Design a protein with these regions (language model features):
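A conserved beta-strand-loop-helix scaffold within acyl/acetyltransferase catalytic domains
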Residues: 144-153, 159-161, 165-184
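A short, internal acetyl-CoA/4′-phosphopantetheine-binding micro-motif in the GNAT/acyltransferase core
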Residues: 59-60, 183-191, 218
């Protein structure tokens, strides 16, 4: 298969930034997470794995399984929406309506393990905060976020006058790699360093657990990419996201 990389990703390679050239668990992060660190949230069978809809729309199957989408079709009800991730572009599978495609980048953390930030205003988020978390995610659109996304764990936020204005957490747990996710700040509170502080706080948690942090971002989100690179994240590979609906 021929892959046409975007100018943004090509520039990353030209500038000699880090890029995995070998097979790696993060080439198929969803399926491998459902086999390992997120096994307790896994549904499906030996061939296909997926999360409960309220946790995440992500679904996956073993690399090279040509019947993967057919098996998912057999396992899920009509109208069920899924999100499929792959470093390569894929043909649209039969039985599925591709509603949206996003070209993204996957980043691996290679920065400092020492953080001097003051985390005193960073608060653990609980079930009682879910409604506010969903509202903030809908407003800022960091990615799919449902009533049970908090089940991935380690969500923290910053409040202003009792209102949740910024948050981040963890999502996929792939072997010894942990994904940072749901990085979002209310538009009335940008420019205050909240995202930077919350990301550093998550990095501290992940590194203390002897895990390798990683994340995904839209390739056209230059503001976020600049922040991640400033923090010590380095691009590892492209990652395409396919939002699909079972016909």
């Amino acid at each position: 298969m021929i892959i046409l990389y975007s100018p943004a990703f090509t520039n990353h390679l030209k500038e000699n930034r880090y890029f995995y050239k070998v097979k790696h668990l993060l080439e198929n992060p969803v399926y491998n997470a459902l086999l390992s660190g997120d096994k307790q949230l896994s549904h499906g069978n030996d061939e296909v794995k997926y999360f409960d809809e309220e946790v995440s729309p992500f679904a996956g199957f073993e690399e090279g399984n040509e019947n993967g989408f057919s098996r998912l079709y057999e396992s899920l009800n009509p109208g069920r929406k899924i999100l499929y991730a792959n470093p390569e572009t894929i043909p649209h599978p039969g039985g599925w309506q591709v509603q949206h495609e996003i070209k993204g980048l996957q980043f691996i953390y290679q920065g400092s393990k020492l953080f001097s930030n003051d985390f005193s205003n960073v608060t653990p988020l609980m079930e009682t905060n879910v409604d506010e978390m969903v509202q903030l995610a809908r407003l800022t659109k960091p990615g799919p976020f449902g009533k049970r996304t908090i089940d991935f764990g380690h969500y923290h936020g910053i409040f202003d006058n009792g209102k949740l204005v910024a948050m981040t957490g963890q999502r996929l747990h792939v072997g010894d790699h942990t994904e940072l996710s749901a990085v979002c700040t209310h538009p009335d509170h940008t420019g205050k360093g909240y995202a930077f502080k919350l990301l550093q706080h998550q990095l501290q948690i992940i590194l203390k657990n002897e895990q390798q942090p990683f994340l995904h971002v839209r390739e056209d989100n230059q503001r976020a990419i600049a922040l991640y690179e400033r923090m010590g994240f380095i691009v590892s590979r492209p990652m395409n996201f396919y939002f699909m609906k079972r016909i």
